[in-house]
């Protein structure tokens, strides 16, 4: 059976149980109201501000959680932007495409922001944000490459799985060409091996639109 993943091997940080990366106990936020104090974990509190975190590898459980959060926020307000912060080494192609399809389907604009590393499927999701609203922090890193996979079994079974991973490769390359404006043959060439970019290089490539510069005290967004 094929394991078609677009996974960055340097960052092997899989946390399938949560759509966020949170080592140790979750930080909590206490809010005071007329009904007394209420405690929220920090990510639930940020979800109320329409902020979602993808800080882990991408698998089916993570995809289900992100899709559910996007659908919930769309139902809450179909006109207000959804922000997705991405620090991910990549993961399952099919799970990533489930997240991607939902990003394209929901009515609100989906803002994508890279912090840390957006590699492989993480970079693909970063590029799939709303045009003009794909951002990266100054010291983030972005990496694109082709899907990784392997198969075993009888020759015919291996042939079937090989055709599937080639189909996924062509699908991802075509979508990335649409989002970046790069020719399909350049995408195919660049993703043949790991291809790392700085935020400024990612702007030139078309993977993102702007680099966030907070040196002025406030969150200032500057053209790359």
Swiss-Prot record:
Annotated disulfide bonds: none
Keywords: Cytoplasm, Hydrolase, Protease, Serine protease
EC number: 3.4.21.92
Main location: cytoplasm
GO terms, molecular function: ATP-dependent peptidase activity; ATPase binding; serine-type endopeptidase activity
SUPFAM superfamilies reported in the protein's UniProt record: ClpP/crotonase (SSF52096)
Residues annotated as catalytic: 120, 145
Superkingdom, taxonomy of origin: Bacteria
GO cellular component, one term: cytoplasm
Reactions this protein catalyses: Hydrolysis of proteins to small peptides in the presence of ATP and magnesium. alpha-casein is the usual test substrate. In the absence of ATP, only oligopeptides shorter than five residues are hydrolyzed (such as succinyl-Leu-Tyr-|-NHMec, and Leu-Tyr-Leu-|-Tyr-Trp, in which cleavage of the -Tyr-|-Leu- and -Tyr-|-Trp bonds also occurs)
InterPro entries: ClpP (IPR001907), ClpP/crotonase-like_dom_sf (IPR029045), ClpP/TepA (IPR023562), ClpP_His_AS (IPR033135)
Cellular location(s): Cytoplasm
UniProt enzyme class: hydrolase
GO biological process: one example: protein quality control for misfolded or incompletely synthesized proteins
Function description: Cleaves peptides in various proteins in a process that requires ATP hydrolysis. Has a chymotrypsin-like activity. Plays a major role in the degradation of misfolded proteins.
Subunit: Fourteen ClpP subunits assemble into 2 heptameric rings which stack back to back to give a disk-like structure with a central cavity, resembling the structure of eukaryotic proteasomes.
Family designation: Belongs to the peptidase S14 family.
Protein name: ATP-dependent Clp protease proteolytic subunit 1
Organism: Parasynechococcus marenigrum (strain WH8102)
Primary gene name: clpP1
């Amino acid at each position: 059976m094929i394991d078609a993943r677009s996974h960055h091997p340097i960052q092997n940080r899989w946390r399938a149980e949560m759509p966020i990366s949170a080592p140790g106990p979750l930080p909590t936020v206490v809010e005071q109201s007329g009904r007394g104090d209420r405690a929220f974990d920090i990510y639930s509190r940020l979800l109320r501000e329409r902020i979602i975190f993808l800080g882990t590898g991408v698998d089916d459980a993570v995809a289900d959680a992100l899709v559910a959060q996007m659908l919930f926020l769309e139902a809450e307000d179909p006109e207000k932007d959804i922000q997705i912060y991405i620090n991910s080494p990549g993961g399952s192609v099919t799970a990533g495409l489930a997240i991607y399809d939902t990003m394209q389907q929901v009515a609100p604009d989906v803002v994508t922001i890279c912090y840390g590393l957006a590699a492989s499927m993480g970079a693909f999701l970063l590029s799939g944000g709303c045009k003009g609203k794909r951002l990266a922090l100054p010291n983030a890193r972005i990496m694109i490459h082709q899907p990784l996979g392997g198969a075993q079994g009888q020759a015919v079974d291996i042939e079937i799985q090989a055709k599937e991973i080639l189909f996924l490769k062509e699908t991802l390359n075509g979508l990335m060409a649409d989002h970046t404006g790069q020719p399909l043959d350049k995408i195919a060439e660049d993703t043949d091996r790991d291809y790392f970019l700085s935020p400024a290089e990612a702007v030139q490539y078309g993977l993102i639109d702007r680099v966030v510069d907070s040196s002025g005290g406030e969150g200032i967004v500057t053209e790359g």
